[in-house]
């Protein structure tokens, strides 16, 4: 059996011949477009964990993305080793050598996986989840807002590398950035049918009411259809399907499937979130060893033999007074996750980029989830973090209403042109794009000018 990647995945929305004597492969050109974009540069001014932002050590969205790229490249390299094929070899009852010869050519190049990891957060608005909440509430009747959907919109429309196709990346690169291939307003709660506090009442804009679902904007349907054109009808229906059928108006629906490249990028993001964000929080004293006890107990009793054996040493090093010991523990954890990555197959797909994914075994995923849940509980949900995000939430909601009240007077000239050229029902999206593209500091500065 020989699998090959459909040449359509190398196409761009607009024909784009390399310049004279430019011999770079397509994904290296994509990588350069991300690195030189304003959206990527803006990540340096967006904080990864707001509560640690007063410390010089803290990570930004930019440094986080660089670390995700390093982990992603390591995962892709690890998938070339024989042990990564063992589980699938047993499942298919075939030789490892045969499977390796078939699957290795499907793996993303280092240029491609780094491109995806560099770009994966560029759609996140200022003030993290607080910003998402504010913009989703303000866009509730206009398609909603969500960070991953905004990433898709930036690379396919907003970033001014071309007039109308954004960065004009290869189709495979764009596919790798799509974590949730459904339309956002179909995945979101049916807001018009719910009795929720009016979102312009800033005192009652609760995150639990207005946190976004996951998907892509209906406004970008032309690019979505272009992206999925190489898929068979059967593959497209399965790829865009939800995990379950909606049973009530409040439900958040999620898709199940991702491309091979996206699965590698998402694992890298999860590892960086679970391990490196924990490192930040320990160093600045956001979490204590007594708080860690609950996670320690779970790790001590988890199904991973390696973790049960090493959790005491890891804990001692993680909370050591010596930075090199903490770094040693962090390195050991990252290595543990990377070296357990393996191939996974979903036989219902025919396109090989959807049929095969990267995954971690159940016992390793269990460990990663313990780390992620701990970071969420003690770092993301930390009261200082939540107060900063809530402040940002109020700022963005206020700014949106101000800009909407007199857009031709208050928006920048280029944004005004886009607003004037948009259909009436699409004008809110133009305001949303402008606010979502701000850094934390710039949003504060603009709001002060308007207040």
Swiss-Prot record:
UniProtKB keywords: Hydrolase
Nucleotide-binding is among the record's keywords: no
Bilayer-crossing regions: none
Molecular function per GO: dGTPase activity
Record-linked InterPro entries: dGTPase, dGTPase-like, dNTPase_2, HD/PDEase_dom, HD_domain, PHydrolase_assoc_dom
Classification via PROSITE patterns: HD
SMART domains linked: HDc (SM00471)
Superkingdom classification of source: Bacteria
Record-level GO BP terms: dGTP catabolic process
Coiled coil: none
HD domain boundaries: 61-274
Family of this protein: Belongs to the dGTPase family. Type 2 subfamily.
Name of the featured protein: Deoxyguanosinetriphosphate triphosphohydrolase-like protein
Species whose genome carries this gene: Actinobacillus succinogenes (strain ATCC 55618 / DSM 22257 / CCUG 43843 / 130Z)
């Amino acid at each position: 059996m020989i699998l090959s990647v459909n040449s359509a995945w190398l196409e761009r929305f607009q024909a784009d011949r390399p310049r004279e004597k430019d011999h770079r492969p397509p994904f290296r050109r994509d990588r350069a477009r991300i690195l030189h974009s304003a959206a990527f540069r803006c990540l340096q001014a967006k904080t990864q964990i707001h509560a640690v932002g007063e410390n010089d050590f803290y990570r930004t969205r930019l440094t986080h993305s660089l670390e995700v790229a390093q982990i992603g490249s390591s995962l892709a390299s690890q998938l070339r080793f024989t042990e990564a094929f063992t589980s699938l070899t047993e499942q298919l009852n075939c030789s490892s050598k045969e499977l390796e010869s078939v699957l290795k050519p499907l793996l993303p190049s280092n240029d491609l996986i780094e491109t995806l990891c560099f770009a994966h957060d560029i759609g996140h608005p200022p003030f993290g989840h607080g910003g998402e909440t504010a913009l989703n509430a303000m866009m509730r009747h206009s398609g909603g807002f969500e960070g991953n959907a905004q990433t898709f919109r930036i690379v396919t429309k907003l970033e001014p590398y071309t007039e109308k196709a954004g960065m004009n990346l290869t189709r495979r690169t764009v596919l790798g950035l799509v974590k949730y291939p459904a339309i956002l307003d179909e995945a979101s709660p049916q807001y018009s049918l719910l009795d929720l506090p009016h979102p312009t009442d800033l005192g009652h804009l609760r995150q639990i009411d207005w946190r976004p679902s996951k998907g892509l904007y209906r406004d970008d349907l032309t690019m979505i259809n272009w992206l999925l054109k190489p898929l068979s009808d059967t593959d497209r229906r399965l790829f865009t399907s939800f995990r379950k059928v909606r049973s009530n108006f409040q439900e958040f629906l999620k898709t199940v499937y991702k491309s091979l490249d996206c699965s590698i990028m998402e694992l890298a993001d999860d590892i960086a979130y679970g391990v490196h964000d924990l490192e930040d929080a320990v160093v600045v004293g956001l979490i204590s060893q007594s708080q860690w006890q609950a996670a320690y107990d779970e790790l001590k009793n988890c199904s991973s033999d390696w973790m049960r054996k090493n959790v005491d040493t890891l804990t001692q090093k993680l909370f050591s007074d010596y930075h090199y010991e903490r770094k040693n523990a962090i390195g050991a954890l990252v290595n543990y996750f990377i070296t357990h990555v393996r191939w996974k197959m979903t036989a219902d797909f025919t396109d090989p980029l959807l049929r095969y994914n990267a995954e971690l075994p159940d016992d390793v995923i269990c460990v990663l989830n313990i780390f992620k849940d701990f970071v969420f509980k003690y770092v993301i949900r930390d009261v200082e973090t939540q107060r900063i995000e809530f402040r940002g939430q109020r700022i963005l909601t206020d700014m949106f209403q101000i800009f909407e009240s007199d857009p031709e007077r208050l928006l920048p000239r280029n944004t005004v042109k886009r607003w004037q050229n948009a259909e009436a029902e699409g004008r809110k999206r133009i305001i949303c794009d402008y606010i979502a593209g701000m850094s934390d500091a710039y949003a504060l500065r603009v709001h002060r000018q308007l207040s």
